[in-house]
């Protein structure tokens, strides 16, 4: 069984779905994702295992913190069990891309052990079921362009700007920002 949560953020309406194994789906804000949010709404509030509800709440909290610039990495467990091996390998390699940094599709392919599979990596990123938790927005085209993004290019640009901005703030200022009440 799956637990789902739909929630408002300053960036727009988002949703998550989790199983007892971990986070299985993140739905980003945007027109393209209206159907996915509608599907999540059909399961939100249903009985689900406690572990699934815990993972969904944890994912929501971490997404909110991330979008406020107060989280750099996601610790929520992922449920990628239904995905093919190559896709899992690429997603786990992408999860290790540091906050505020970018890599090219080719570099990510090499990190996943398939240096000649840049296009296949691009397809995996396009189908990433858990964006933000697996930061596919940090993967860019070799020529310096943004590359594709399932959550729309403007959102990718905004996510990268958030990270680059927060990376340029001094550690003291960052501590002060974290200490402020919401």
Give the residues covered by each predicted segment.
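Basic nucleic-acid-binding alpha-helical/helix-turn surface characteristic of O6-alkylguanine DNA
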Residues: 1-116, 162-169, 182
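Short glycine/serine-rich loop segments
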Residues: 116-158
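Acidic, glycine-rich catalytic/binding loops that coordinate metals and/or anionic ligands
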Residues: 151-168, 173
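Short, low-complexity, charge-dense intrinsically disordered segments
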Residues: 172-181
